[in-house]
From Swiss-Prot:
Source species: Geobacillus stearothermophilus (Bacillus stearothermophilus)
Segments traversing the membrane: none
Any GO MF annotation of the entry: metal ion binding
Reaction(s) this enzyme catalyzes, per UniProt: Release of N-terminal amino acids, preferentially methionine, from peptides and arylamides
The protein's Enzyme Commission number: 3.4.11.18
Protein name per the record: Methionine aminopeptidase
Amino acid sequence: MIICKTAHEITLMREAGKIVSATLEELKNHIRPGVTTKELDAIAEEVIRSH
């Protein structure tokens, strides 16, 4: 079954996508040997909360 989204829902999805994109871009700058997933989680949380 296909559920149609309202314009507002699409706007929210677009905003969420931008936040995910920004988070992944920031994580890309910090991924290197020796960096733990806990550290990456903290960075991701910081970026997400800043939006």
